[in-house]
């Protein structure tokens, strides 16, 4: 079987403060700045900005 990529798992936390988060894999070699996405937060029931944090 093929090896899994050497991607880094990061947590995308809602800026709304609901505690909802997504987990995403990213390539540490390509990206220098932190990720931020506008995604759906089901707790807030709207699209909000999600910012990258370290996954513990």
From Swiss-Prot:
Q: Does the keyword Ribosomal protein apply?
A: yes
The keyword Transmembrane helix belongs to this UniProt entry's keyword annotation:
no
GO MF terms, alphabetically ordered: structural constituent of ribosome
Cystine connections: none
Record's InterPro entries?
Answer: Ribosomal_bL33 (IPR001705), Ribosomal_bL33_sf (IPR038584), Ribosomal_zn-bd (IPR011332)
Q: Alphabetically list the UniProt keywords.
A: Ribonucleoprotein, Ribosomal protein
Any GO BP annotation: translation
**GO CC terms:** cytoplasm; large ribosomal subunit
Instruction: Tell me which family the UniProt entry assigns to this protein.
Output: Belongs to the bacterial ribosomal protein bL33 family.
PANTHER family, per the entry: 54S RIBOSOMAL PROTEIN L39, MITOCHONDRIAL, LARGE RIBOSOMAL SUBUNIT PROTEIN BL33M
Name of this protein: Large ribosomal subunit protein bL33
Q: Which organism is it from?
A: Anaplasma marginale (strain Florida)
């Amino acid at each position: 079987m093929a090896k899994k990529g050497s991607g880094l798992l990061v947590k995308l936390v809602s800026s709304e403060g609901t505690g909802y988060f997504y987990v995403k894999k990213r390539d540490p070699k390509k990206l220098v700045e932190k990720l931020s996405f506008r995604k759906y937060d089901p707790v807030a029931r709207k699209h909000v900005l999600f910012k990258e944090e370290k996954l513990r």
